[in-house]
């Protein structure tokens, strides 16, 4: 039996999740929703994906352009087993009563507060916690990036301090900024630390800045260790951690630009880099402190987590079988 999946919201995350669903042999994409007939809606239709209006109020927008929709979100909910809510932050919580009324499982994204779901999720860290659940929240791109690497070294970590250098906007976003400033998040610590703690029990504090770039986030991480660990140990751990890749400055990876170019060279859709990129040379140990720097492709690192969450919620596979299946289907390198 294939799980019937709907995607509510077909923007940066939604269209990538929808694509990923089509690559699974145990899932079926039933349809997606849009609020207006923009180029993404037309492209979905060209791909043969049924397009639904996000609500009745948006139907006139489609009728005005002669764009025939398959129905509304409520109609889509009647046909699916699960809905992946990829709407803007805060909208998912407002949509939850619709999903509850329809008796449909739902996955929310990191823009929602943790209490929208029964569990916050990163597959390699807490897959089992989502088994059989009705509502799961896949944490944000930044939180996913932190959890991926920190969960791998958690047994050695006493306290984590991380500085988040966040991209200002996604490449197709013309509404956000800044374009000529560095904007600190003056609420210290930032929300990222507590968000990590919704997935793994770890002592962590974070600070954040927004900088004028669209490509990736960068994290500068310092870990106070409670157990001895060498640089080579950390390199070995990360080399054997799924969805984490080591990049070397000596091989030309001296910025996020080259890392994104690497993703383009893989010929992946939308130059997705599902893996967290760690600069190998940045891994260092001074006394009882571990340092490393990582980059996060904010448009795509959460996509495999959404797929694994679906499998966990329907208990289709155990943790590593699901991760391996997702990795293979999306061409994830390890």
From Swiss-Prot:
Q: Does the keyword NAD apply?
A: yes
Under PROSITE patterns, the record lists: GAPDH (PS00071)
Does the keyword field hold Oxidoreductase?
yes
Pfam hit, one: Gp_dh_C
- EC id: 1.2.1.59
Catalytic residues, chain numbering? 141 (nucleophile)
Q: Pathway listed for it?
A: Carbohydrate degradation; glycolysis; pyruvate from D-glyceraldehyde 3-phosphate: step 1/5
Q: Which residues bind NAD(+)?
A: 12-13, 111, 167, 298
Q: How does it assemble?
A: Homotetramer.
HAMAP family (UniProt xref): G3P_dehdrog_arch (MF_00559)
| Protein name (Swiss-Prot/TrEMBL) | Glyceraldehyde-3-phosphate dehydrogenase
Q: Which organism is it from?
A: Pyrococcus horikoshii (strain ATCC 700860 / DSM 12428 / JCM 9974 / NBRC 100139 / OT-3)
Source lineage: Archaea, Methanobacteriati, Methanobacteriota, Thermococci, Thermococcales
């Amino acid at each position: 039996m294939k799980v019937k999946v709907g995607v509510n919201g077909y923007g940066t995350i939604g269209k990538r999740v929808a694509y990923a669903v089509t690559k699974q042999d145990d899932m079926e994409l039933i349809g997606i929703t849009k609020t207006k007939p923009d180029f993404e809606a037309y492209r979905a239709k060209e791909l043969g994906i049924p397009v639904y209006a996000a609500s009745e109020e948006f139907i006139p927008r489609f009728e005005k352009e002669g764009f025939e929709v398959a129905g509304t979100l409520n109609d889509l909910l009647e046909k699916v087993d699960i809905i992946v809510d990829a709407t803007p932050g805060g909208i998912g919580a407002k949509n939850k009563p619709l999903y509850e009324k329809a008796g449909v499982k739902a996955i929310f994204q990191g823009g929602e507060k943790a209490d929208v779901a029964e569990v916050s999720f990163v597959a390699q860290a807490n897959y089992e916690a989502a088994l059989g659940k009705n509502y799961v929240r896949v944490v944000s791109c930044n939180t996913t990036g932190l959890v991926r690497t920190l969960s791998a070294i958690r047994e050695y970590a006493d306290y984590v301090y991380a500085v988040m250098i966040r991209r200002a906007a996604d490449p197709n976003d013309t509404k956000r900024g800044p374009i000529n400033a560095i904007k600190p998040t003056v609420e210290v610590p930032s929300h990222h630390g507590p968000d990590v703690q919704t997935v793994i029990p770890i002592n962590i504090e974070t600070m954040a800045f927004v900088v004028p770039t669209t490509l990736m986030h960068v994290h500068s991480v310092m870990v106070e260790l409670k157990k001895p660990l060498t640089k080579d140990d950390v390199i070995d751990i990360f080399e054997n951690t799924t969805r984490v890749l080591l990049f070397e400055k000596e091989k030309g990876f001296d910025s996020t630009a080259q890392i994104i170019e690497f993703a383009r060279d893989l010929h992946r859709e939308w130059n997705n880099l599902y893996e967290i990129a760690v600069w190998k040379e940045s891994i260092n140990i001074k006394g009882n402190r571990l340092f490393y720097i990582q980059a996060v492709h904010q448009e795509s690192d959460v996509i495999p987590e959404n797929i694994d969450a679906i499998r966990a919620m329907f208990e289709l596979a155990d943790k590593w079988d699901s991760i391996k299946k997702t990795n293979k289907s999306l061409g994830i390198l390890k």
